[in-house]
Amino acid sequence: MKGEPKTYSMSDLSYYGEKAQQQNEKQQKQYVVRRNSTQSTSKQNVSVVLEDNASESNELPKGFILYASLIALALSLFLAALDIMIVSTIIEEVAKQFGSYSEIGWLFTGYSLPNALLALIWGRIATPIGFKETMLFAIVIFEIGSLISALANSMSMLIGGRVIAGVGGCGIQSLSFVIGSTLVEESQRGILIAVLSCSFAIASVVGPFLGGVFTSSVTWRWCFYVNLPIGGLAFFLFLFFYNPGLSTFQETMDNIRKFPSQFIEIVRNVAYHLLKIKGFSKLNGWRKPFMELIFMYDIIEFVFCSAGFTCILLAFTFGGNRYAWNSASIIILFIIGIVLVVLAGIYDFLVFPKFNIVKATPHYQPLMSWTNIKKPGIFTVNIALFLTCAGYISQFTYIVQYFQLIYNDSAWRAAVHLVACIISTVVTAILCGAITDKTRQIKPIIVISSIFGVVGAGILTLLNNNANNSAHIGLLILPGVAFGGLAQSSMLASQIQLDKKSPTFRSDFVSITTFNTFCKNLGQALGGVISNTVFSAAAIKKLTKANIQLPDGTTVDNLVIYRQTNFDGSHSKLGNIISESLTDVFYMALGFYALSLIFAVFASNKKVTASLR
């Protein structure tokens, strides 16, 4: 009737959804074979380029379209990266307010763990729904988590908000690199990955400064409120300027003018997939959605892997703090965690490929495909990245703690000391991208970066309460060089190992790119918790040995609170104990970098494919 709002039936939404699905599938042509014959050679160069926005002319985006898409991706990635680094300067204030320093590592891990575990899932979600729709959904989830964190009234609520933000941040990080890699040819991906990595590094610069200013001048809650306007800007930039299939400036502007209808199409597309799942349960019973969960999204491996790593991290968190290391609770958590992770690997590598339905359905692939991961060129660089990230996040976090706990610096002043580390990360990422573009070499960059990591971590162990101002700057440069070089090169080194002629190249490309993100984020998650455990255990042991009794008991929480309210100089007994405990953390980081170098040496010598111009 006139005046009544229009409603959509199941069939209506199915129709619109099928229409959106057909358009999405048309836009997601992934393979373009370009053949180039020259007069000077009889050889035919073949370059297979993965494209997410293949148009009718099969041309990659250029000019304004390319730059606008990259800006949208870079800002989205900046948003996710900002939330990692901005919390490094609020640790003391949050611990003081909630009295939970032993759980402070979960400010990083609560964000990084879902970032790691869900990295492999986001690519699977994006394939049927569309990369654009999925990216927008990820930004919305991230914003919800940020708002919860800003309003938190307890450590548990704050960690919960960080977990939700981590779910969205994971989608942003995973899809940014997947989408970005489809916008240019293989030979130019090094530069593109460097540009996106720089947005991460710039967030690393801005994050601690913003966190320090907010914590010192306003409140630490603004470290999360600031994500809301930045996230809104990223959302609309990506909504307007990333449009697969549109190759000209005029087409993009026409598309922006059609924003209402475009937004409705996105909602209809998402609604179609949700109703399709609902329709399966009503019309076809439980079998088809169950099969999709088991084989399309590999839910069994995901549950085993998530539960396993969560148990392991909980054991590291509570061990030596709430429970003794040899207590039954900690031992059981370790055993269950390790068993579940091993079962996840066995299931994906050995059991999953044996199912007949998997053999008959090409798009049913495990989250971690042994066919790809077992390749030395992929396995070695990603393990090296995992170890480097674990060491780097440990150094990054406790460098801030060094200046706050030993010298009683404010959050803002402590953040200033990170500039040397972060600038070296940015410069290295850009330089490595340019070198790869010119020489097509990757392994030398990976090995040299790992060597710098070992040397830098070794030198950083000299950072104690006797170090002078020049040491405060110089000792932080090499860790940034190591992280910037390896984070930029490992993804490209993994991608070039894939067979471009394989019928599963598209899914393999997405899988390997997200696996690289998985290793990076898992390294940060484990590094954040393990470094917190090492510091706490070392500090308690040294306090007990020195027979120092704190007013409210010998715990790391009481140590930090007492130090803040009763600062007695950098060379006092407490100052020496904290300095020695921080040195133990830096030695742990050195161990991570040393292992990373071993794997980097065995990286593949394969070069990047030359561009056809």
From Swiss-Prot:
InterPro entries reported for this sequence: MFS (IPR011701), MFS_dom (IPR020846), MFS_trans_sf (IPR036259)
Stated name of the protein: Azole resistance protein 1
Function summary: Transporter protein required for adaptation to high stress imposed by low-chain organic acids, in particular by acetic acid, and for resistance to azoles, especially to ketoconazole and fluconazole.
Regions that span the bilayer: 71-91, 103-123, 135-155, 164-184, 190-210, 222-242, 299-319, 330-350, 376-396, 415-435, 444-464, 473-493, 582-602
Membrane association type: Multi-pass membrane protein
Residue numbers on the Cytoplasmic membrane side: 92-102, 156-163, 211-221, 320-329, 397-414, 465-472, 603-613
SUPFAM superfamilies: MFS general substrate transporter
PROSITE patterns per UniProt: MFS (PS50850)
Gene of this entry: AZR1
UniProt superkingdom: Eukaryota
Induction of its expression: Transcriptionally regulated by PDR8.
Cell membrane recorded as keyword: yes
Annotated compartments: Cell membrane
Organism: Saccharomyces cerevisiae (strain ATCC 204508 / S288c)
Xref: PANTHER family: AZOLE RESISTANCE PROTEIN 1-RELATED (PTHR23501:SF198), MAJOR FACILITATOR SUPERFAMILY (PTHR23501)
Main localization category: membrane
Residue numbers spanned by region Disordered: 1-38
Any single GO CC term annotated in Swiss-Prot or TrEMBL for this entry: cell periphery
Ranges facing Extracellular side: 1-70, 124-134, 185-189, 243-298, 351-375, 436-443, 494-581
Family: Belongs to the major facilitator superfamily.
GO molecular function: azole transmembrane transporter activity; transmembrane transporter activity
GO biological process, one term: transmembrane transport
Key words, A-Z: Cell membrane, Membrane, Transmembrane, Transmembrane helix, Transport
